[in-house]
Amino acid sequence: MGLSILMVGNSLTAANAMPTILASLLDAQVVAITRGGARLAEFSNPLTKTGSRVLQALDGDGAQAEHGCFDYVIAQDMSHLPATNPSAHERAVAKICELARDHNATPVLYGTWGYREGSAKLKKLGMSAAQMGQLMHEGSLRAAAAHGAIFVDMAKAVAQMEDASWFYAADGVHPSPAGSQFVAQTIADALNR
């Protein structure tokens, strides 16, 4: 195995075993620490269960091969936070980037997409899919640039699709199996540059 990757995120990361797909594409070891609905901020907070797990994985103890010595930490935030609270998103990105670098890993921000037009969650936010996608792109791009993370811009990638219906699961938020494959390939391409 070549690369060793720690992925942190929520169900947008875990859906359809996307970390396993990424591992296969890169012939890498991928350790995923996820919790449905999680915000990125909790992954760098040692007082949370997920934060404690991340620190344990990064610190490693030598007894488990899957812990410690990661080349990359790939981080994904709550599905709408870069659009709805970009300052909170940027603070979380700053902390996870610092944590990754403190453990000699390169930080990668996996920026997610706007919700599908017509989805219930998008209606709740009171914006169009195009507006959300643009805000997701801007919020994540700004955070990644400010803190020196490699940026995987899924908001832009999905927004540029002529027909993105195949990308989404039925809820209009999560990726379909083909969508998760596309996300994994996009991340792999970014790491291979």
Model feature map: region roles:
Residues 3-8, 12-94, 101:
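Conserved SGNH/GDSL esterase-like catalytic core that processes O-acyl groups on lipids
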Residues 31-33, 108, 150-152:
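General small-molecule cofactor/ligand-binding pocket signal
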Residues 34-40, 114-117, 157-159:
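Acidic helix-start/capping segments at beta-turn-to-alpha-helix junctions
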Residues 72, 78-85, 115-134:
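Serine-dependent acyl-ester chemistry module
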Residues 77, 109-112:
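A cross-domain feature marking catalytic cores of carbohydrate-active enzymes
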Residues 98-108, 149:
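A short helix->loop->beta-strand "cap" motif at the edges of active sites that frequently abuts
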Residues 120-193:
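Catalytic His-Asp segment of secreted/periplasmic serine-dependent ester chemistry enzymes
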